[in-house]
Amino acid sequence: MQNRYGKLASWVYNLDKPVGRSFGDQAYYRQRLEHCDAGPILEPAVGNGRILIPLLEAGYAVEGFDASEEMLDYCRAACRARNLSASLTRQTFAEFSYDKRFTAIILPVGSFQLVTDVASANAVLRRFYDHLAPNGRLIVDLDPIGGFLGRSGSIRSWMTDDGDLLTLTDHRVETDYVAQTTLSHLRYEHWQGGNLVATELDLFKLRWWGVNEFSLALRAAGFEDVVVSGNYQHGRAPQKDDEIITFEARRPANEGI
Protein backbone atom coordinates (compact mmCIF):
# COMPACT_ATOMS: atom_id res chain seq x y z
CA MET A 1 0.00 0.00 0.00
CA GLN A 2 1.32 3.44 -0.93
CA ASN A 3 2.46 5.88 1.79
CA ARG A 4 1.29 3.64 4.62
CA TYR A 5 3.27 3.64 7.85
CA GLY A 6 2.93 0.02 8.95
CA LYS A 7 4.45 -1.73 11.95
CA LEU A 8 8.12 -1.64 10.93
CA ALA A 9 7.91 1.74 9.21
CA SER A 10 6.37 3.30 12.32
CA TRP A 11 8.95 1.63 14.55
CA VAL A 12 11.79 3.02 12.44
CA TYR A 13 10.19 6.46 12.37
CA ASN A 14 9.88 6.47 16.16
CA LEU A 15 13.54 5.50 16.55
CA ASP A 16 14.77 8.00 13.97
CA LYS A 17 12.51 10.91 14.95
CA PRO A 18 11.62 10.44 18.62
CA VAL A 19 9.33 12.79 20.51
CA GLY A 20 11.15 16.04 21.22
CA ARG A 21 13.71 15.78 18.44
CA SER A 22 13.83 19.06 16.57
CA PHE A 23 15.07 20.02 13.13
CA GLY A 24 14.60 23.68 13.97
CA ASP A 25 10.85 23.30 13.58
CA GLN A 26 9.83 23.06 17.25
CA ALA A 27 11.06 26.50 18.24
CA TYR A 28 9.79 27.97 14.98
CA TYR A 29 6.28 26.60 15.37
CA ARG A 30 6.06 27.69 18.99
CA GLN A 31 7.16 31.18 17.99
CA ARG A 32 4.63 31.36 15.15
CA LEU A 33 1.78 30.01 17.29
CA GLU A 34 2.36 32.87 19.73
CA HIS A 35 1.06 35.13 16.95
CA CYS A 36 -2.16 33.14 16.55
CA ASP A 37 -5.40 33.69 18.40
CA ALA A 38 -5.94 31.55 21.48
CA GLY A 39 -7.82 28.35 20.79
CA PRO A 40 -7.48 24.78 19.56
CA ILE A 41 -4.71 23.77 17.15
CA LEU A 42 -4.80 20.85 14.72
CA GLU A 43 -1.84 18.81 13.49
CA PRO A 44 -2.78 16.54 10.57
CA ALA A 45 -0.44 13.57 9.99
CA VAL A 46 0.55 13.86 13.65
CA GLY A 47 2.69 10.71 13.54
CA ASN A 48 4.32 9.72 16.81
CA GLY A 49 3.74 13.15 18.37
CA ARG A 50 7.24 14.53 17.82
CA ILE A 51 5.82 18.06 17.50
CA LEU A 52 2.44 17.68 19.19
CA ILE A 53 3.73 16.52 22.56
CA PRO A 54 6.21 19.38 23.16
CA LEU A 55 3.42 21.80 22.22
CA LEU A 56 1.09 20.12 24.71
CA GLU A 57 3.79 20.40 27.36
CA ALA A 58 4.10 24.10 26.54
CA GLY A 59 0.40 24.58 27.24
CA TYR A 60 -1.04 24.62 23.72
CA ALA A 61 -4.37 22.89 23.08
CA VAL A 62 -3.27 20.65 20.23
CA GLU A 63 -5.03 17.64 18.78
CA GLY A 64 -4.17 15.52 15.79
CA PHE A 65 -5.06 12.81 13.36
CA ASP A 66 -3.12 10.29 11.32
CA ALA A 67 -3.94 7.62 8.75
CA SER A 68 -1.67 5.10 10.51
CA GLU A 69 -3.00 3.40 13.62
CA GLU A 70 0.54 2.19 14.36
CA MET A 71 1.83 5.77 14.47
CA LEU A 72 -1.08 6.84 16.65
CA ASP A 73 -0.22 4.03 19.08
CA TYR A 74 3.26 5.53 19.54
CA CYS A 75 1.76 8.98 20.05
CA ARG A 76 -0.76 7.74 22.61
CA ALA A 77 1.93 5.82 24.50
CA ALA A 78 4.17 8.90 24.61
CA CYS A 79 1.27 10.99 25.92
CA ARG A 80 0.51 8.44 28.65
CA ALA A 81 4.16 8.34 29.69
CA ARG A 82 4.01 12.10 30.26
CA ASN A 83 0.52 12.18 31.81
CA LEU A 84 -0.76 14.22 28.89
CA SER A 85 -4.24 14.07 27.46
CA ALA A 86 -4.74 14.56 23.73
CA SER A 87 -7.51 13.97 21.22
CA LEU A 88 -6.00 11.65 18.59
CA THR A 89 -8.05 10.06 15.84
CA ARG A 90 -7.45 7.91 12.79
CA GLN A 91 -8.43 10.02 9.78
CA THR A 92 -7.10 10.87 6.34
CA PHE A 93 -6.29 14.15 4.63
CA ALA A 94 -9.16 13.62 2.21
CA GLU A 95 -11.89 12.85 4.73
CA PHE A 96 -10.98 14.37 8.11
CA SER A 97 -13.81 16.19 9.83
CA TYR A 98 -14.32 18.06 13.11
CA ASP A 99 -17.30 19.85 14.59
CA LYS A 100 -15.08 22.72 15.69
CA ARG A 101 -12.88 25.31 14.04
CA PHE A 102 -9.20 25.74 14.80
CA THR A 103 -7.11 28.85 15.30
CA ALA A 104 -4.17 27.14 13.57
CA ILE A 105 -3.46 24.06 11.48
CA ILE A 106 0.19 23.00 11.31
CA LEU A 107 1.99 20.54 9.02
CA PRO A 108 5.70 20.31 9.82
CA VAL A 109 8.44 18.55 7.81
CA GLY A 110 6.70 18.05 4.50
CA SER A 111 3.74 15.93 5.60
CA PHE A 112 1.53 17.65 3.03
CA GLN A 113 3.69 16.26 0.23
CA LEU A 114 2.23 12.82 0.90
CA VAL A 115 -0.76 14.10 -1.11
CA THR A 116 0.56 13.56 -4.62
CA ASP A 117 -2.47 14.29 -6.81
CA VAL A 118 -2.84 18.01 -7.51
CA ALA A 119 -6.64 18.05 -7.50
CA SER A 120 -6.66 16.13 -4.22
CA ALA A 121 -4.08 18.49 -2.73
CA ASN A 122 -6.17 21.51 -3.68
CA ALA A 123 -9.22 19.89 -2.10
CA VAL A 124 -7.25 19.27 1.10
CA LEU A 125 -6.18 22.92 1.23
CA ARG A 126 -9.82 23.92 0.96
CA ARG A 127 -10.67 21.44 3.71
CA PHE A 128 -8.02 23.08 5.91
CA TYR A 129 -9.55 26.46 5.12
CA ASP A 130 -13.02 25.25 6.08
CA HIS A 131 -11.72 23.95 9.42
CA LEU A 132 -10.04 27.21 10.39
CA ALA A 133 -11.75 29.92 12.39
CA PRO A 134 -11.80 33.39 10.85
CA ASN A 135 -8.27 34.81 11.15
CA GLY A 136 -6.98 31.26 11.68
CA ARG A 137 -3.61 30.34 10.23
CA LEU A 138 -2.28 27.47 8.17
CA ILE A 139 1.44 26.76 8.53
CA VAL A 140 2.93 24.21 6.14
CA ASP A 141 6.49 22.98 5.62
CA LEU A 142 7.53 21.78 2.16
CA ASP A 143 10.78 20.14 1.12
CA PRO A 144 12.24 21.83 -1.98
CA ILE A 145 12.98 19.90 -5.15
CA GLY A 146 16.59 19.33 -4.11
CA GLY A 147 15.40 17.08 -1.31
CA PHE A 148 13.75 14.77 -3.84
CA LEU A 149 16.51 14.33 -6.37
CA GLY A 150 19.40 13.24 -4.18
CA ARG A 151 21.18 9.91 -4.19
CA SER A 152 19.04 6.78 -4.20
CA GLY A 153 19.81 3.35 -2.78
CA SER A 154 20.71 4.35 0.77
CA ILE A 155 20.74 1.80 3.60
CA ARG A 156 20.22 2.94 7.19
CA SER A 157 20.08 1.00 10.44
CA TRP A 158 18.95 1.45 14.05
CA MET A 159 19.54 -0.58 17.21
CA THR A 160 16.65 -1.02 19.62
CA ASP A 161 16.99 -1.00 23.40
CA ASP A 162 16.66 -4.80 23.31
CA GLY A 163 19.55 -5.15 20.89
CA ASP A 164 17.46 -5.85 17.79
CA LEU A 165 18.52 -4.35 14.47
CA LEU A 166 16.17 -2.49 12.13
CA THR A 167 17.26 -1.60 8.60
CA LEU A 168 15.76 0.55 5.87
CA THR A 169 16.73 0.33 2.20
CA ASP A 170 15.46 3.23 0.09
CA HIS A 171 15.42 2.72 -3.68
CA ARG A 172 13.87 5.36 -5.90
CA VAL A 173 12.21 3.69 -8.88
CA GLU A 174 10.58 6.64 -10.63
CA THR A 175 10.93 10.38 -10.95
CA ASP A 176 8.10 12.03 -12.88
CA TYR A 177 9.16 15.56 -13.81
CA VAL A 178 5.74 16.36 -15.27
CA ALA A 179 3.68 15.27 -12.25
CA GLN A 180 6.51 16.47 -9.95
CA THR A 181 6.56 13.21 -8.03
CA THR A 182 9.02 10.57 -6.91
CA LEU A 183 8.20 6.94 -6.17
CA SER A 184 10.45 4.86 -3.92
CA HIS A 185 10.49 1.27 -2.74
CA LEU A 186 11.20 1.20 1.00
CA ARG A 187 12.27 -2.15 2.43
CA TYR A 188 12.19 -2.44 6.22
CA GLU A 189 13.82 -5.42 7.95
CA HIS A 190 13.80 -6.54 11.58
CA TRP A 191 16.77 -8.66 12.70
CA GLN A 192 17.22 -10.60 15.94
CA GLY A 193 20.49 -12.36 16.72
CA GLY A 194 21.49 -12.29 13.07
CA ASN A 195 18.17 -13.75 11.92
CA LEU A 196 15.68 -11.90 9.75
CA VAL A 197 12.34 -12.09 11.58
CA ALA A 198 10.17 -9.58 9.68
CA THR A 199 10.15 -7.65 6.42
CA GLU A 200 7.94 -4.83 5.19
CA LEU A 201 7.93 -3.39 1.67
CA ASP A 202 6.24 -0.04 1.13
CA LEU A 203 5.69 2.16 -1.89
CA PHE A 204 6.40 5.76 -0.94
CA LYS A 205 5.30 8.58 -3.23
CA LEU A 206 5.89 12.29 -2.69
CA ARG A 207 5.24 15.47 -4.66
CA TRP A 208 7.34 18.60 -4.80
CA TRP A 209 5.88 22.06 -5.31
CA GLY A 210 7.26 25.26 -6.75
CA VAL A 211 7.20 28.21 -4.37
CA ASN A 212 4.94 30.32 -6.56
CA GLU A 213 2.83 27.27 -7.44
CA PHE A 214 2.00 26.55 -3.81
CA SER A 215 1.42 30.21 -3.00
CA LEU A 216 -1.12 30.36 -5.83
CA ALA A 217 -2.77 27.15 -4.58
CA LEU A 218 -3.18 28.69 -1.13
CA ARG A 219 -4.77 31.82 -2.57
CA ALA A 220 -7.05 29.73 -4.80
CA ALA A 221 -8.27 27.95 -1.66
CA GLY A 222 -9.23 31.32 -0.17
CA PHE A 223 -6.21 32.12 1.98
CA GLU A 224 -4.70 35.58 2.29
CA ASP A 225 -1.46 37.12 3.59
CA VAL A 226 0.75 34.29 2.32
CA VAL A 227 4.25 34.51 3.80
CA VAL A 228 7.00 32.21 2.50
CA SER A 229 10.08 31.65 4.65
CA GLY A 230 13.29 29.70 4.22
CA ASN A 231 15.01 27.50 6.80
CA TYR A 232 12.70 28.54 9.65
CA GLN A 233 13.63 32.22 9.42
CA HIS A 234 10.24 33.88 9.30
CA GLY A 235 9.88 36.43 6.52
CA ARG A 236 13.23 35.62 4.93
CA ALA A 237 12.58 34.63 1.31
CA PRO A 238 13.69 31.10 0.42
CA GLN A 239 17.12 30.67 -1.12
CA LYS A 240 18.36 27.96 -3.46
CA ASP A 241 20.23 26.02 -0.78
CA ASP A 242 17.49 26.08 1.86
CA GLU A 243 16.51 22.67 3.22
CA ILE A 244 12.93 23.57 4.15
CA ILE A 245 10.39 26.14 2.96
CA THR A 246 7.53 27.22 5.21
CA PHE A 247 4.26 28.76 4.04
CA GLU A 248 2.01 30.65 6.41
CA ALA A 249 -1.40 31.84 5.29
CA ARG A 250 -4.51 33.24 6.96
CA ARG A 251 -8.23 32.70 6.59
CA PRO A 252 -9.77 36.18 6.31
CA ALA A 253 -11.22 37.53 9.55
CA ASN A 254 -14.33 38.95 7.90
CA GLU A 255 -15.71 35.56 6.87
CA GLY A 256 -18.16 33.61 8.96
CA ILE A 257 -17.56 30.13 10.30
How would you name each of these model-derived features?
Residues 1-39:
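Conserved class I S-adenosyl-L-methionine
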Residues 205-257:
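C-terminal lobe and adjacent flexible extensions of AdoMet/dcAdoMet transferase-like proteins
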Residues 139-213:
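SAM-dependent methyltransferase
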